[in-house]
Amino acid sequence: MKKRRIYLHIGTEKTGTTSIQEFLYENREALIHKGYYFIQSAGVRNNRALPSYAMRDDITDDFFQDRNINTPEERKKFREYTKQSLDQEISSLPDSIHSIIISSEHFHSRNTTSSQINIIKNLLSPYYSDIKIICYIREQTETLSSLYSTLIKSGTIYDFSYHLKFCTPRNSYYNFETMLKNWVDNFGEDKLCVRRFDRKTFINCDLIDDFLSCLEIEPSEDFSRVKKPQNESLNPLGQVIGLTINQAFPNQLSDKAIISKKRKLLSIIDKNFAGKGVSVTPEQYSEIFEAFRETNREVNRKYLKSDGDLFPYKEPINNQVNIDQNSILKLILQLINFTPLPGSFADLFRDAALLYESQDLEKAFIFMELAQKIRPDGVVINKKLNEYREKLK
């Protein structure tokens, strides 16, 4: 079998990977004409089956849950199928293909040990004569803030303060020195192409042009560009709504119909409430920046061949949740008038209100009012609204 060069894009998460993958998918034919092939058997956009291939049997996630892969035997069959499919796909490539592109941000979040990355190396080694690991890294607090929106879309029941606790140098998800070392230990430092996720440092101030430069491809009119933003964050209001729905209806519920409805609702929120979400306070930013300063400087020195701080010190604007009446009216208009919801969603809003009534009556009132917009004649809904109005006087 002809061996080729492999470009392995490992993320990291929250560094425009969805936009890159959409570009690669939409330009498959143009890339083939230039001798590059974007792997499809492991996932048509996100090649997620490959990082999942290297995960331990005792660790599961949404990838396996969605596919009902629950036992060690089912994992074994999944690995056999993934390996066979990849082999068939690469074996069938014409000789004109000199380079293979693989992309998944889940290499960053799911393959967190050197031994897991070694599994990836062993899987790919029959197919490459050379390999280049492409990795974008983003300042830790920005990563956290963007990740929080993704976690809400995925069903987290924990608020921002909970996830903030994990943003420490002990966590290889955020500690890029530790994370990159695992890849170096398996592939060698010279195989890594580490880029700072910062528009000011991109080639032509453009992420796609920058990524193409990593592939040693000149930007050209041969490629179509995806103009619609991909995988945007939720604004604070969308985050509050999404979190409340998740808390009322956690993913572990056995009622699949309710979970399906919840996902549809989260999708509506995603489409209508894009924007900058909550961020750390200036004090939290300063503490986190200092905690990562030395490891970030080492990454800057080792991989970017530069001295000083990896990221500029830039305190965020404190973007905390502030729900006012105008925002609620906007929510009602967008979620119900602009995108009509089926009557069953009144139950979701009603139960979200009941969840909040003992701890935050104003939020309970907001969600019960949403339920009334969908089901104006609901007896329990109207009774509760009257109770809330009396208590809020």
What are these regions (language model features)?
Residues 1-360:
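Anion-recognition interface
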Residues 348, 380-381:
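TPR alpha-solenoid repeat register
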Residues 355, 387-392:
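TPR/TPR-like alpha-solenoid repeats
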Residues 370-371:
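Canonical positions in the second alpha-helix
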